[in-house]
Each structure stands twice: as structure tokens, then as C-alpha cells.
Amino acid sequence: MRDCCSSPKAIPAPPRHALDQSLGMDPRHTSSSGAAEGASCSERPAGSLACPSPNCSPLPETPRAHGALTSDNSGTTLFGKPEPMSSAEATPTASEIRNPVFSGKMDGNSLKQADSTSTRKEEAGSLRNEESMLKGKAEPMIYGKGEPGTVGRVDCTASGAENSGSLGKVDMPCSSKVDIVSPGGDNAGSLRKVETISSGKMDPKTENVMHSRRERPGSTGEGDLVSLRENDMKPPDNTDSASTKKTDPEFSGKLTPGSSGKTELVSSVTVAPVTSENVNPVCSGGAGPAAVGNSETLSSVKKDPQLLGKKEAVSSGEGGSVSVRMAETVSARQPEGMFPAKTDSTSSNSTGPSGRADPVSLRNSELVSPVKPERLSSGQAERVSLVKTETLSSGKEDPRSSRRVDHTTVTGNMQTSQKGNPESSGKTDLGSSSSGDTRSLGTWGSLSAAKAEVTEGKGDPQPWKKASLPASEKTDPLASSKAGSASQGKAETVSPGEVDAMTLGKTVPTSSGKTALVSPGKVDLMTSERAEGIPELQASEKGNPVNSTRVDTGATGSTEPKSGVKVITQIPGATSPGKVETPSLQKEQPQLSEKTDPSRKVDPPTTVEPVSLGKADSASPSPRKAESQTSAKTVPQAPDKATSSLRQSDGTPYSSAQPQRDTRSIGSLPEREPSASTSQKDLAAAAAQKSPSAEAAAPPPGPRTRDNFTKAPSWDAGAPPPREDAGTQAGAQACVSVAVSPMSPQDGAGGPAFSFQAAPRAPSPAPRPPSRRDAGLQVSLGAAETRSVATGPMTPQAAAPPAVPPVFPEVRVRPGSVLAAALAPQEATEPVRDVSWDEKGMTWEVYGASMEVEVLGMAIQKHLERQIEEHGRQGAPAPAPPPAVRAGPGRAGSVRTAPAEGAAKRPPGLFRALLQSVRRPRCCSRAGPTAE
């Protein structure tokens, strides 16, 4: 890789030279210059490295490229180098396309923008350019770029866009650069590093990365991605270089950013690679580039005061870097000013966690940073974090900053995106994301960015809306769905790709990685293209910031994909979109394994969705289809996963929103994208999985259990309940049934239990009358039986029932007298029967507290009195009636009265004993017999 790097380095002279020219031109930002450079770039690209290529590419972006270059030359180098890599692929296209488009557009636009932005950044003239480039330019570039190739290219250039351009194809290179910058996954590491590197280091590293990337392009393969991811992951810093190298391979390059030492990074990277091409270019590229470029520039400028502080931080801490970078990027890009402080802080915050805190951060970040974050974010959750933070931080700023940044950053990107591309869109999404929104995201992201860009992010809403529509068209669908998913998953822009969402959902890192995968421009592309139209509304609808975030991811993924679609297609250069995606996915999938599988398979519902993305990507060779599928599917999946993640991380909202969006997107996409059979399949699979999962999971267990329990218990309860108290009976039976059912076949167990319960109750008419009589008392009865059942589910029931029935009959007989006929007797009788006569029942009552102790005691007393009277001990018929009458009015009254009479008739000790017995079941049972 280094060697490659060396080559680039060797070429460096030309590249740098070119850069210089480029820079010179950049400052001029002459379109012709850009064109020329583009030509030269092409020529240089002929040189493979033809750093000029980057320059060329960037030339249009030259400002951007310049920025990139400025970024440290790294940009150039990166740029150049990656470009070489990309260059061949992307550069020409990007160059031509980009240059023209961007050149004019970018130059003027970005230049101006850049200039103003850069102004602050001025410090880094290149920064300025770069930033401009990145920001104004790169984005525009990207925007203009709008072309896949261009995008790829633009990203590079624009992103300094290298990222963008690079992103797409250059992505690798650019990515490298950006990646280096951070754009990639390293985002954090890389970014940081890159940033640092970028600053000074970047050059080499960048170059390396570029080179690496370049070299790796082939490699880029997935391995790179993967390895990148891993490597990057591991050594973000190193990764920067190494990773970068690794990453270099096209995706790798991208990955690198993505690889970003972290998966997230990877994600980013991946995204960068896959998405990267798409997303990353935009997001990454844009954001990354912009951010990166910017960052780089920042990095470069790092030196910038603002950056400096930040940058230093950035440089200093890689995470810091990232953060800073991000922030810077954001800031810078944002307008540096905008976020800087905030970003910085945020970034910092983020960064720390950034890393991975990133998911959330990421999401935000991505959003915020989107452009950068995306890349960064994506790649780097950190960045994301940063971004996120920014977003968060931005929170407020968010709209402005974030959005602005996003816009701006994104905007640039977005524009680019818009124009440029899905990618941009994606990016924008990111930006948007920040702002967010699904709707926005994809949409606005695209649009907004493009437009709002766009402007600003200020116009966030507008941009969003605007962007939304366009973006929406483009990104939204996918973005929406995807973003939703992605967003959801992570919102993460990170996922920029889709995965992000998924991944995000899953893990930022993993997600990232995966996302990157999924994200991979492919899905995104597809989705983007596909979704674009469809989800537009969705995206629009989604336009929520939150959504944005979410969408962002999706959008990013999506958008990027869009861009990516093209880009990817071209970039596929590295690999065919389908292929690349697949590889990336596959590769990353391994890492993401869960995800991956799903990705490929889409089986895992959760994973599937995101994976779906991946899968769709993989499966559907046609990115678009896959994308659609993925998109559709991913969204769902991502939602699931993401939802979980999001819910947890992000919170339900994302999830919720996402799901809806996703669903919608999905529905939409699938329908609209039927073209992609894969998508449909994926969707179907996803749906099936999802539904099935839900159905199977919830229904099977629930239904079976419920049916079994409910059925057995219900039936049991049904028959007995009438006889006894519904509440008690139900509880008892249910308990019994449940206990029995679970263990024994529910049917068998349930049946027996029923039989027992039913038999006891059926045999004794008492139960039925009790139901007629006092519900409370009856409950006691039922409870007693039930308890019996519970105690001795099978045998005890039989035994208990016999005991109970006798008691009941006795009670009945006794109450059967005139007193029994009376209402009071009914109430009292039942309770008394259960309580006094049925020891178990009584115990149950007491312990179960089915009835209040006092009530039971009174009932018992009454019952005893009646019995006594009946027996004739002291019982004169006269006394009995009064109790009945009194009882009628109320148990309490009757009881009290009865006791008085009873006392007169009988020894007070008996009553006392009864009362005590109530409290002491055993005594009570003794008392009863004694009383009699």
C-alpha cells in the first residue's frame, strides 16, 4: 500500500505539482482550469495516479480539489492519488463531468462559498478553497457532479471532495483522501489522523491512502473494506495510513475512512466505499470530503485558528481530530464558524465517545456533519459523534449549524448531491440528516443539501423542503426508507449507507461496517434511485429532524446510492455496484455477520432489513434493484434492528418514525421498485421475516399459550364460573389450568382440572346456589375448591370436593330452614358455609382474604347462631328471625345484632371464639363444631 502510496508520492511531484497547478487554478477556480485540469487529470490519471487527476477532478472542484489539495496536498495527494485510483475511473468521468459542472458551478459557487467560508478558513487558503470546494465546491461538485462518476469523482474533488469523488470511485482515492481525511471510517482515526495527516500528514498518508486506495482499488474489494474496516477499525490512526492503504482499495479506501478504525468508520468507509461511492461521496465525500476535505483542510488548516484549536484537538487527539475534524469540517464546512465552536465541543464530546458513541452521535453527527460525519460519522461514529454532537450541539445549531452545516456542508455536498447526486443527496442527507430528516434527509438531504445547501442549512427547512422534494425524489424513497432504516438503524448517517441504519441500529460500528456495506452505495444507489421517487414524499413527510437524522442515514445511504447508483455503477469501477455492494456487503457482512447474513439473506429479520439492504445489494446485483429492495427491505429491517438500536440508542421515535417511513418506503419501494425483483424479494423476505417473526414470535407463543391456557382455563372457568365466583373461579381455575397445562398437555391437564373442579362443583348443588346467593361468599367457596385444586391439582380436588359438598349440603340444610330462605341467610349462609364449615374454604378465605376477616367473622357468627337456634340449644325461632331480618339490612348490622341476641341466648364465649376463629382458621373450624 505504502508502495502504492509511494507511487503516488513519487507522483506526488506531479500530483502535488498538479495540486499546485490545481491550487493555482483552484484559486482561480477557473472552469477551464478545472476542465483543463480535468483533462490533465485524465491525462495524469493516465498516469494512474495522475494526481492531477485528482486535481483535475477536483479542479472543477479544484477549489475543492484545491481544498482537498490544500487540505494538505493530501487532498491532492489523496486526491491525486486516490484519484488515480479513482482517477482512472472516477476522475475522467468526475473530472469531465465534475469539472464542467462543478467547475462552473462549483468554482463560482463553491468558490464564492468557499471563499466566504474559507475566509474564515482562509487561513488555509487551500482550506478555503477546499472548504469552498468542499463546501461550496465539493458539494456543488458533487452536486453538479451529480453524476455517479462525477460524484465519485466529485466527491473526491469536491469533497475534496475527494471524498465525494473519491468516494464514488475516487472515493477510494478520495476516500482515501477523505478517508484519510477521515472521511472514511477512520474517519475518526483516519479522519483524525488524516486530518492530522491531512494537515501535514495527510499528505503522505493521504497520499498513501490515496495510493493505497488506488492500488487497492482492486482490492478495494471488499477485503479492503473489511480489512479496512478491521484494520481501520483497529488502527484508526494507522488505519488512516494503513487502513487507508487498505482501504485504499477502492472501497477500502473508502472504507478506510470507513474503516476508519472503527466499524463505524468502516461504515463510513464502507459506506464510503459502497455507499461511499454513493453515499460517502456525498456524505462521506461530501461530508467526508467536505468535512474531510474540509476537515482535511481544516486539518490542514487545522492549523487554522479555529481549526487549530479544533484541529489541534483533532490532530491532537485523533478522536479529537475526528471530533475536531468533524467539527471543523462541519465548522469549517459549516462554516467553520458555524459549528466550530459548537462542533468543537460537540465534536469533542462526540469525539470522545465519538467514537462510537457515535451511533447516536453518529446519527446526529452524521446529520450534522453529515457530509463529513457521514463519512466521518459514518465511518466514524466519532465523527458522527462529533457531527452528532454537532448536531446535538448543533442541536440548536443543528438547524442552522447542523442543517446549515449539513446543508452547507451537505449543502455543498448536497448541492452536489442534488445535482450531483444521490450521493450528494446521501450526503446531504447526512447533512440533512442532521437536520434531518428522513424526509428531509433523503430528501432534503439531497435537496436541502443541494438546495439548502445549500445553502445553508439555514434554510434548513426550506432546503429540506426543497431538497426534500428533490432529494426526496431521489433519496427520499430510499433514503427515507433506507434512511429510515439506516437512520433508524442509526439514523446514523453513518449508515450513510443503508446499513448504517441497520448497522447503525445494530451497531454503529458494526452497523457502520455493515452499513457501510449496506449503505454501500449500492443499496443506497438503488434505493436512492428508486427510492428517490417514491419516498420522496415519505422523505418529505419524514422531514423531521429526527427523521432527518434517520433519514439521513437512509437518505444518505439512499442518496448516496443514488449518486452512488451512478457512481457506484461507475465506481463499481471498483466493483460492479452489485458486486461491490455484494463484496462490501459480503465482506462487511461477515463482520456484520449477523447483519451480513441477513444482509445477504435478509433472513434475519432484524438484520435482514439492513442486511436486506446489504443483501439486496449483494443479491441484487443490480444496485438499483437491490437498492430498492434493500431500501425497502432495509428500511424495515433497519427499522427492526435500527429500531431496537434506535429505540434504545436513539429512542423509539426514530424507530417509530422509521418504521412508518420504512414501511412506507418499503411498500413504496417495493411497489415502485418491483423492477427490482430482488427488492421485492428482499422486501417480501423482509416482510415475511418481519411479519413471520412477529407473527410467529408473538402469535405462536401467545396464541398457543393463550389458547391452551385460555381454552382450558376458559372452558373450565366458563363452566364453573357460573356456579362460583367468576373472579375467584377464574383465578383458581386459571392457576390450576396454567400450572397443570404448562406441564401436562394443556388439553389433558386442563380437562382433568376441569373435571375435578367441575365435578366437585357439579356434584354439590351448593355451588350453584352460592352463585345465586352471595358473590363474595361464593367466591370463598370457589376459592376453597380452587385452592384445593391448586394444592392437589388432581387428587386433592377429588378429595376436597367431597369434603366441600358435604359441608355445603349441611349448610344448606341448616339454612334451608326459614332463616335460610331469608335474604340474610343467603348471604350469611354462603359465607358461613364456606368459611365455617369448609375448613379449607375458611382457611382459604382467611388466608386468601377472599372476604374480609370481619365479614367472614360476622358471617360465621350468624351461621353459628342459626345453627344453634336450629339445633334448639338456645334457639328459639324468634331469635332466629331477628338475625335474619337484621342480616338482611346488612351483615354488619345483622351480625352485631345477632351477637347481642346470641350472647343473650348463648354464652358470649362462643361468639368470641368465632371471632377469634375467623382470625384463626383452625379455631374457627373447631368453634363451628363446638358451637353446634
Swiss-Prot record:
Keywords tagged on the record: Cell membrane, Cell projection, Lipoprotein, Membrane, Palmitate, Phosphoprotein
Region (Disordered): 1-149, 178-808, 866-908
Positions of disulphide bridges: none
Region feature Interaction with GNAO1, mapped onto this chain: 821-932
Residues where lipid is bound covalently (S-palmitoyl cysteine): 923-924
Comp. bias intervals (Basic and acidic residues): 118-138, 202-217, 227-251, 301-313, 395-407, 594-603
Compositional bias ranges of the Polar residues kind: 257-281, 343-353, 408-423, 545-561, 583-593, 642-660
Cell compartment(s), UniProt: Cell membrane; Cell projection, Growth cone
Listed Low complexity bias regions: 31-43, 424-443, 479-491, 684-697
Gene Ontology annotations of biological process type: neuron projection development
Topological relation to the membrane, as annotated: Lipid-anchor
Record-listed Phosphoserine modification sites: 22, 33, 190, 369, 377, 393, 495, 519, 714, 817, 836, 917
Modification after translation, per record: Palmitoylation on Cys-923 and/or Cys-924 is required for membrane targeting.
Pfam families (alphabetical): GRIN_C
Primary localisation category: membrane
Expressed in which tissues: Expressed specifically in brain (at protein level).
GO MF entry, a single one: phosphoprotein binding
PANTHER family for this protein: G PROTEIN-REGULATED INDUCER OF NEURITE OUTGROWTH 1, G PROTEIN-REGULATED INDUCER OF NEURITE OUTGROWTH C-TERMINAL DOMAIN-CONTAINING PROTEIN
Assembly notes: Interacts with activated forms of GNAI1, GNAO1 and GNAZ.
Official protein name in the record: G protein-regulated inducer of neurite outgrowth 1
